[in-house]
Curated annotation (Swiss-Prot):
This is Anaerobic nitrite reductase HB2. GO terms for molecular function: heme binding; metal ion binding; oxidoreductase activity; oxygen binding. Heme b binds at residues 48, 62, 66, 101. The keyword Metal-binding applies. Residues 5-154 form the Globin domain. GO terms for cellular component: cytoplasm; nucleus. Belongs to the plant globin family. Its cofactor is heme b.
Length: 161
C-alpha cells in the first residue's frame, strides 16, 4: 500500500474531537457499544463481556477499555497517517489484534458496523462541533486501521494447519 495523504487539518480534527470525547469515557463507551448492538444485535455474542447480559452493562471495565482502545487507536492512526503516510502499529500489537479478531470470527462487515457506531458516537459526543469534515477524518483513519487489522487476520488465516 502506497503513502496515504492525511492532512494536518484532518489530524487536528481527530485529535480535537478525541479530547472532547475523553472527558466522559464511561458515557461514550456505553453509547458506542449500544450503537453496535442497535446496528447488529447478533454482535453481542462476539464480545465476552456482553454475552451473558441482555443490555450493555453500565460499569463494565472491559467494555470501557475496549471502546477506549478503538477510539485511541483510530486517533493514533490519524497521527501516523499524517506523519508517515501509513499505519505504523507495533508488529506485535497488530499481530495480536489480527489474531484476536480472527479467533473471534470477525468478518469484513463487522468492521463497517464498528465504523458506523464510531460515527454515531462522534455525532452524539461532539454535538454542534460535529460535521462532515470530522466524520471524514475519523472514517479515513479508522478505514486504514481496519485494513491493517484485516491484513493481519488474513496472515493468521493463512497460517492455519
Amino acid at each position: 500500500m502506497g503513502e496515504i495523504v492525511f492532512t494536518e487539518k484532518q489530524e487536528a480534527l481527530v485529535k480535537e474531537s478525541w479530547e472532547i470525547l475523553k472527558q466522559d469515557i464511561p458515557k461514550y463507551s456505553l453509547h458506542f457499544f449500544s450503537q453496535i448492538l442497535e446496528i447488529a444485535p447478533a454482535a453481542k455474542d462476539m464480545f465476552s463481556f456482553l454475552r451473558d447480559t441482555d443490555e450493555v452493562p453500565h460499569n463494565n471495565p472491559k467494555l470501557k477499555a475496549h471502546a477506549v482502545k478503538v477510539f485511541k487507536m483510530t486517533c493514533e492512526t490519524a497521527i501516523q497517517l499524517r506523519e508517515k503516510g501509513k499505519v505504523v502499529v507495533a508488529d506485535t500489537t497488530l499481530q495480536y489484534l489480527g489474531s484476536v479478531h480472527f479467533k473471534s470470527g470477525v468478518l469484513d462487515p463487522h468492521f463497517e458496523v464498528v465504523k458506523e457506531a464510531l460515527v454515531r458516537t462522534l455525532k452524539e459526543g461532539l454535538g454542534e462541533k460535529y460535521n462532515e469534515e470530522v466524520e471524514g477524518a475519523w472514517s479515513k483513519a479508522y478505514d486504514h486501521l481496519a485494513l491493517a487489522i484485516k491484513a493481519e487476520m488474513k496472515q493468521e488465516d493463512s497460517q492455519k494447519p
